[in-house]
Amino acid sequence: MSMIQDFSSRAACRVVGGVYDFAASGFPAVVRIETTNACNARCTICPHQSMTRPVVTMDEGLFRWLVDECAAWECREIHLHNFGEPLLDRRLEDRIRYAKAQGIAKLKVFSNGSLLTEERARGLVEAGLDEIKISFDGASREEFEAIRRPLKFDRIVENIARLVEIRNAAGSKLSVLVACCSTSDKTATMRELERIVDGFSFGRVHNWGGGEFAERPRGVRKSCSRLWRTFTVLSDGRVALCCLDYDARHVLGRIALDTTIRDVWTGEEYTRVRSLHREARQDEIPLCSRCTKSFF
């Protein structure tokens, strides 16, 4: 039986001795839809300013095509973000409503929080968003504003607190999370944020698929679970190798109104890349050869 036959609609993986043992799937467990790759920040830890692909907001027809296929395959989780600030998409709330109407169980957004005005916060809550994670790099005002230019520390804190208040008043089940990369200890402000949100995590710095660091990582490399679990569609319909492929350096296919997620997911290039990972030959894939994520 081939890898693409007789699969369930979900992907599963387990770790055995530091190596991923995969049960593959005929459809991804998570589909990441980049509705826009525009961003209003110039963060020092992000290569967005190095991106050469055009800034595009996804066509509504393509978006609905993707969501409809996810619904047909009972894909339970869609992320409405990738390499941009999703709140720059003025149709975001309408897209959330459409996806929820099609039966998508979990919709997530990753945002820098700068555009979370009262109006947008209410709109996200009312549309039925299930989870929002705010990227909040820097424990102090000075560290934050040095990294996340030109965003303002106090404004983001205020926006997060107001979103939580609006969520609570509406009786919404929206999860509000904060993700932080910092070299400093937690400040009083960070501890207060940690108290009011539903989850607070300190993440590890990575090198964007080897794009920002020339030095090869050291240690034991593992197969990358993303290839068996997550599918990333860029705003122009191209399918990136993973969410770290910010400049579409390794395109696995393109979704159009006559091409499906499943066509690409079970296609020749995806299968080839997975085989290289299973055989510990990631170095033959330029994007993977220096990526630090496979060492975590």
Where are these regions (language model features)?
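Conserved alpha-helical substructure of the radical SAM core
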Residues: 2-131, 142, 150, 154, ...
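Generic structural signal for small/hydrophobic residues in well-ordered secondary structure
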Residues: 35, 39-40, 59, 85, ...
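The −1 position to Zn-ligating cysteines in a subset of zinc-ribbon hairpins
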Residues: 38, 42, 223, 287
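Secreted/processed peptides and extracellular or luminal domains of membrane proteins
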Residues: 45, 49-52, 230, 248-249, ...
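Short, cysteine/histidine-rich loop/knuckle motifs that typically chelate Zn2+
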Residues: 45, 226, 290
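Conserved AdoMet/S-adenosylmethionine-binding subsite of the radical SAM
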Residues: 90-215, 226
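C-terminal accessory region of radical SAM enzymes
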Residues: 161, 165-175, 194-215, 219-222, ...
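Short, acidic, Ser/Thr-enriched surface-loop or helix-capping motifs
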Residues: 233-234
